[in-house]
């Protein structure tokens, strides 16, 4: 989806003013970048929204990286013994204008991956990160055994941030991108 598609069919929870703010890439590349937290149930349009925003950022020549959190965690666990590779990945992720973590704490991740995720968020301080999740920050801590790490990670995500809660009454994928029936 593109920004034009999103503007033509915005989720009802996003009024014109916040939508205009999201279209303006200043929240990503301005002097005070913000994190974006998009919360909603399956089918609520979270991915539709974040893909349109990512496409808009790319069209403005900003660098964007998308990770499903479980895939990032698997990669981090795979290179766990290679400290240099882990540090290189953290450094690489920290350089993007916008990093998107989708399916955020939909499933548990290893304590190692959680610690490195904290390092990534620390390295991204002052840069925009988008979190896409079915649950809010109050639930993420349930997936993180170390409560100090949980509080610190959540604090780095939420401050400073914008939050959009989608209620899921409409499945935007079905509504605006119908597939042919065979």
Q: Which residues are covered by each model-predicted region?
A:
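Short loop/turn elements that form and flank the Walker-type P-loop nucleotide-binding site
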Residues: 31-32, 60, 93-96, 124-127
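Residue-level preference for the first positions of well-ordered beta-strands
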Residues: 35-37, 64, 98, 130
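Post-Walker A helix-loop "phosphate-sensing" segment adjacent to the P-loop in P-loop NTPases
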Residues: 55-67
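N-terminal pre-Walker A segment at the start of P-loop NTPase domains
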Residues: 3-26
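Walker A/P-loop nucleotide-binding motif
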Residues: 32-49
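Conserved hydrophobic/aromatic pocket- or pore-lining residues that grip, position, or stack substrates
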Residues: 6, 50, 68
């Amino acid at each position: 989806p593109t920004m034009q598609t999103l503007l033509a069919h915005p989720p009802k929870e996003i009024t014109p003013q916040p939508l205009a703010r999201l279209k303006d890439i200043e929240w990503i590349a301005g002097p005070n970048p913000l994190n974006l937290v998009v919360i909603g149930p399956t089918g609520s349009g979270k991915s539709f929204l974040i893909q349109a925003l990512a496409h808009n950022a790319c069209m403005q020549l900003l660098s964007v990286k998308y990770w499903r959190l479980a895939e990032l965690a698997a990669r981090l666990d795979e290179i766990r013994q290679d400290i240099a590779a882990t540090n290189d990945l953290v450094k690489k992720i920290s350089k993007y204008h916008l990093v998107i973590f989708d399916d955020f704490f939909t499933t548990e991740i290893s304590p190692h991956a959680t610690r490195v995720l904290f390092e990534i968020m620390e390295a991204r301080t002052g840069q925009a990160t988008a979190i896409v999740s079915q649950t809010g920050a109050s639930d993420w801590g349930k997936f993180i055994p170390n409560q100090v790490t949980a509080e610190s990670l959540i604090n780095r995500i939420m401050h400073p941030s914008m939050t959009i809660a989608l209620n899921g009454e409409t499945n935007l994928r079905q509504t605006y991108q119908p597939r042919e029936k065979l």
